[in-house]
Amino acid sequence: EILLGKLSVNEGMFYENVIAQMLVAAGHKLYFYTRYNQEKHRNDMEIDFILSNHSKLRYKIFPIEVKSNDKYSIRSLTRFNESFRQRIGGSYVIHPKNLSVKEGVVYLPAYMTFCL
């Protein structure tokens, strides 16, 4: 079911944890980002994972959103990219579809997570 994109909410969390494990196994330190909106009393932006190139001279970050379904929104990723434009080295969405690149965002199937 993971590969077919037929996951429930709880299984979606499982999917995200599998991706986290793959990133850690590849040697990455994992970071995340949330922004709390005081007026709405909720998080209005959340990035699942942020990787870093650890360069002292040209430090860049790489936000990653994990999507377990075929239909999804990347509003948080788009807003994050706008807010931190100077620091972004590349943006990724890990999803159940094929590899593609649209508007500067690389969309990777889950099995290609090791490429990051």
Language model feature labels by segment:
Residues 1-116:
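A cross-kingdom feature that marks ATP-driven nucleic-acid transaction machinery
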